[in-house]
Curated annotation (Swiss-Prot):
Biased composition (Polar residues): 1-12
Family membership noted in the UniProt record: Belongs to the SPC25 family.
Any one of the GO BP annotations: chromosome segregation
Main localization category: nucleus
UniProt subcellular location: Nucleus; Chromosome, Centromere, Kinetochore
Role noted for this protein: Acts as a component of the essential kinetochore-associated NDC80 complex, which is required for chromosome segregation and spindle checkpoint activity.
Pfam families per record: Spindle_Spc25
The organism of origin for this protein: Emericella nidulans (strain FGSC A4 / ATCC 38163 / CBS 112.46 / NRRL 194 / M139)
Protein name: Probable kinetochore protein spc25
Annotated region described as Disordered, given as residue ranges: 1-24
Length: 257
């Protein structure tokens, strides 16, 4: 710091006082709008829409699952009835076989009745075969319906994962992409451009959405559980999903350093 020079304090060296109407240096600075309010608004809007999307998807999956269970119960009841028919048929068949044996023992004395009994037996065997064929066809139809239900459930799961509104903003803002995790109640969030020395390095975590409170099941690189639980507690309390994604990105950056 330079020392004070008394000669510079004389009125002759003092610059004239600034006019009251002269513009200040602060007035001449450019106005900067950082857009924090807009960003906060968009983050809140995204969080609300994301929660609504998760809730709608959960309700839809639960509704389809309930419908599937109802349909499955009906099919199982049909199968049970068919099984009972089979048991009745087997019982009738056993009774019939006993009748045939008795009639065969009397064949010498009742040769004339053998033809009639044989025809009756053949008729019943034909009827039994026809019933067996009907049972097989019914079982095949049940299996087809079950497969159709499973296929429909898989289709709904795929649609729910693909229908992700308002995520382009976060993908661009946080270098983030969202993928399916192989289950209907999980999403996989993948970050990139985390380190300046290696922009291709990626980090990800799987988020469970089956209940109101979110849960992280897996992450790579592995994050400290205490830090994860702290972030999840904040998210489940304030429901600010955008802020949670930003905090998770910071955790991965620290883990990769």
């Amino acid at each position: 710091m330079s020392s004070f020079d008394p000669s510079l304090s004389t009125s002759g060296m003092r610059p004239p006082l600034a006019s009251a109407t002269a513009p200040s240096m602060a007035d001449s600075l450019p106005s900067i709008n950082f857009g924090f309010e807009e960003l906060r608004s968009r983050m809140a809007q995204f969080t609300a829409q994301f929660d609504a999307f998760i809730e709608r998807g959960r309700k839809q999956v639960l509704e389809e699952r309930n419908q599937f269970k109802i349909g499955l119960a009906e099919l199982q009841e049909d199968e049970r009835m068919r099984q009972r028919d089979i048991e009745i048929l087997n019982l009738k068949s056993q009774t019939h076989e006993q009748t045939l044996q008795k009639e065969a023992a009397e064949a010498a004395e009742m040769h004339a009745a053998v033809s009639s009994v044989t025809l009756e037996r053949d008729s019943r065997l034909t009827k039994r075969d026809r019933l067996k064929q009907q049972i097989e066809e019914t079982q095949k139809a049940i299996n087809q319906k079950l497969e159709a239900q499973r296929s429909h459930s898989r289709y709904l799961d795929a649609q729910a994962r693909l229908n992700v509104p308002e995520l382009e903003f976060w993908q661009d803002y946080l270098c983030l992409r969202i993928e399916g995790a192989g289950r209907e109640d999980r999403l996989k969030f993948v970050y990139s451009h985390l380190l300046e020395k290696d922009w291709e390095a990626e980090a990800w975590f799987e988020l469970g959405t089956s209940s109101r409170d979110y849960e992280v099941f897996h992450s790579r690189p592995k994050l400290d559980r205490e830090y994860l639980d702290r972030e999840l507690d904040i998210l489940n309390e304030d429901r600010d999903f955008g802020a949670f994604l930003k905090r998770m990105r910071r955790l991965f950056i620290e883990a990769l350093k």
